A protein has these predicted regions:
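Conserved N-terminal catalytic core of the sugar/cofactor nucleotidyltransferase
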Residues: 2-5, 13-15, 27, 31-103
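Short alpha-helical oligomerization interface
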Residues: 19-24
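Conserved core of the sugar-phosphate nucleotidyltransferase
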Residues: 113-191
Length: 238
């Protein structure tokens, strides 16, 4: 399996809050946000990881050291020399480095899901989206039919209670590339001004593919995408 970790964002909110290092290098409870995020992927440590990071972050040695400590040995680091149009484009830049016939599992760098929740034995369907239930409209949302099949996925439009955690599975890396090209490259489509991954599943659904979700209990999900969320996590009792 190809594990793609998107780290290409600017982290404006953390900069405004006074942080002077990239978001994923911030330390909370003795671990960097990078390490907390990678704990989520503990079941996949033997797979091939591809990290996409801003070149100006000079983060290669940081990632190498973190991977050595965590136990991730098979990885590539791709440095980006420009800001992308969103997570979907960032992930697409990893495709040339993937085994295109193998599945691709894309994850962000600012969510900690407790170890053991995301495992490869629960993945089903042509597409698979780990979700949890949370309040607010700032998530991607997945609507299901009565059989548990995804029938619609929307960014920042609350069509259901199932919120994505920022992890996205596609049956093959080649399939991801084909959908990305159809939805974003050929049509120039944007959702809320960006190229998000979530809407790509609508293309799959419209073309008869099966998209499923995982419903993770909220107590196992710790979102670390803003300074406020980091403070909440800091104050959680172990």
């Amino acid at each position: 399996m190809n594990i793609v970790i998107t780290m290409g964002g600017l982290g404006y909110r953390f900069q405004k809050a006074g942080y002077t290092v990239p978001k994923y290098q911030i330390e909370v409870k003795g671990k960097t946000l990078f390490e907390w995020s990678m704990i989520s992927m503990d079941a996949f440590k033997k797979e091939t990881f591809i990290f996409l990071v801003r070149k100006e972050d000079n983060a290669t040695s940081f990632i190498e050291n973190e991977c050595a400590r965590i136990g991730i040995s098979n990885y590539k680091i791709i440095e980006l020399d420009r800001l992308t149009k969103g997570q979907a484009e960032t992930a697409s830049l990893a495709i040339p480095y993937c085994d295109k016939d193998k599945p691709i599992f894309i994850y962000n760098i600012d969510t900690y899901v407790e170890a053991g929740q995301m495992t490869d034995d629960i993945i089903i369907g042509d597409g698979f989206i780990p979700c949890f239930k949370a309040e607010g409209d700032h998530w991607s949302f997945v609507k299901l039919d009565s059989n548990g099949n995804a029938i619609e996925v929307r960014e920042k439009t609350r069509i259901s209670d199932y919120c994505t955690i920022g992890a996205y599975y596609f049956r093959t890396a080649q399939l991801y590339q084909e959908i990305y090209d159809e939805l974003y490259v050929k049509s120039g489509y944007l959702e809320h001004g960006e190229q998000y991954i979530a809407p790509m599943y609508n293309w799959m659904i419209q073309h008869g593919m099966n998209v499923r979700i995982q419903d993770i209990e909220p107590k196992y999900v710790h979102v670390l995408g803003t300074p406020e969320e980091v403070e909440v996590f800091k104050n959680l009792k172990n």
